[in-house]
Every structure is written in structure tokens, then in C-alpha cells.
């Protein structure tokens, strides 16, 4: 999930893909990437309705006026657990090492760069564009977000290494212009997109993602993720499945990648101990903090946990007392019950010191599918397998 304190990427779909080269990895079994966290002064804050608005824009949904107003005004600024908001991965690009936000809901690798002003670079590790890379002539990129923020720049080809996995000639989108909203989160230096290359936003020719470049060099063309919160480290593994990280048997769901996302269908859902509901189609997205569902499911779950739950115009989303005990939310995938503990749904106070909390689940604003963001994913061991393609789910060990 791209945070930069307030943002998540909005995408445009393209059809053609440019090429990059993988370097054959030894040994071929795979590599592990561990979490990093930069030590920066001050307290990191997060714009909660900004997170929500940006997730909606990312998937082409209409942002309700109340959510937009709350996001722009910054009326719900808070400090949740660090690992509940963003998942950073150390990435070496040329001679520079940056901490990038790991995002399975986008297909761009874009970074803070030496093309920014010195004040914009302050506190960030940046990609030195004059070091080893080669500028891709005529190529550019530009993104905009639900809170009004934006970034754009040039494209370079360079060597990119993540946890020992190396791609040569990888497209790197170097920020040349950036709005002020991006500068607040000093931990985060950019984005590592891991969706399908068909939605890469480089113009005029979309580029391959890092994963699509390197997957042929791995023992298996997959990556596996263990997202965790409350200060525990998370892990990203390329090329192999680590049986020590999950319990039981992996349950697989077919992926529909026609729109460029890791989209799957769960057989049913359940609120608490209630009856099973209908099937749910959604996207597995590490780049979205929240779990976005049909509004009827959201209201049903929150009303069961606290009858006074409300969709607050001032907070820009569903809120409830922080003391409320919320029911678990379960989705069944090929016979496996993936459980989101109720405590995860109680995400964060709407503002520092508030007794009202912002819901970790929010409405999908009628887009017709769900977004299985970090609120869901951090309770699971998840395998993103390009063969099929398919997704594997199991309870974390």
C-alpha cells in the first residue's frame, strides 16, 4: 500500500509491454526479503479518509463527496501501528538502495529521484539517475490520486535487485515533479508494483514489472507474502513456498487477470457466527490498507459489533467507539475459512486521542467488486502464483 502518509496509486490500462532481462538466479529455489523500517524523527501520521479515497480512485470508483472533503481537509489524522499502514521492502536500483512500498495492486516501479529539488529529497533515499542507468528516450509517466496529489517524471533502464533477485534493463520511473502530500512520510521512498504488466502506466509503451522480468529465473514463478501488524516483521519470498510460515493446506483460487489485477472469487462470507452469505469477487492488494466490501456487508458487520456505528461525514467513513468488540469476518475460499479477527477491523482512532475509531472495513462505493487490502491479507499467508495464474491462502503459522 502506498502511503506517503496519504496516497495510493490510480492506474490506467495499456496493452503493449516493453522488455527487460532477468539474470538467472543461483540457487534457483528462491530468496527472502525482510521488512525494513527507517528511523526518522517525529511521529508519522496518516490521513484515514485519504487512504480510503485513494483506494477508491485506484479502481475507478466514485469517491463520495463527504470522503473527499474529509480527505482534503485532513480532519481524520491519526497514528496507527506502523506495520498496519505500509509494508516496505529494501530495493537496490543501480547504486542506490531505497525502501519501497510493496504493492500487488499496481504495476509501476516509481521512486524518489535525484531529479527532484534538494528540499523534496530531504529525509528520503533517492535514485541517482546519473549513476548507472540509461534514460528511456521519449518515455514518461504521470499519476494522480484521490486526495489531489500527483507525481510524474522520466523513465530509466537500470539494474534492480530485491533480496538477491536481480533484473537488468528494468524500467524505473524516476520522479521529477511531486506534490507536497508525498513528502510527509519519510520512511517511504517509492513504489514496487507487483500486479500484471498490462496496467503499467509508462507512456507511450508500458513496461514490464519487476516480477514479470525475473519470474523465469526463479525456481517457481511465484512470490509469497506474510504481512503482519503490531510491530512484527513481514516477509516477501520469491520463487518458493515456505511451509514453516503457514498451517494446514494451501487453498487455491483461480485468478482473473484480464484487468491486470490479482482478482479472485471467494465462495462465501460470514459475519461472526452468522449464516454464510453469497460469493465475493475481489482483488488481493497489499497496496490498499483497508478492506473494501459491499456496503450491505459493512453495515451488517459493524451493526452487529456496535448498533450505533455510523457513516460519519466529518470522518469520511464508518466509525464506532474504540471500545467496541467487533465480530470476526470470514471468507471461504475453496473450502478454507480465511478469518479476519474483529480486532483488525478496529483500525485506528479517527484522530489522536479520540475515543471513536475508523473502520478497517469500508464501503466499496458500488464498484461491483471487493478490495482485499492489508486488513484481510495480514491474517493470511498468501501465494501469488503466475502459473494459472492463481492465489493460495492459508492461516499464518
Curated annotation (Swiss-Prot):
PROSITE patterns: ASP_PROTEASE (PS00141), PEPTIDASE_A1 (PS51767)
Catalytic-site annotation from UniProt: 103, 285
Protein name (database record): Penicillopepsin-1
Provenance organism: Penicillium roqueforti
Organism classification: Eukaryota, Fungi, Dikarya, Ascomycota, Pezizomycotina
Temperature and thermostability: Optimum temperature is 50 degrees Celsius.
Annotated glycan sites: 311
Record's subunit section: Monomer.
E.C. designation(s): 3.4.23.20
The family this protein is said to belong to: Belongs to the peptidase A1 family.
GO biological process terms held by the UniProt record: proteolysis; response to ammonium ion; response to pH
Residue stretch(es) of the prosequence: 21-71
Further comment: Used in the production of blue cheese. During the fermentation process, aspartic protease hydrolyzes casein which leads to clotting of the milk.
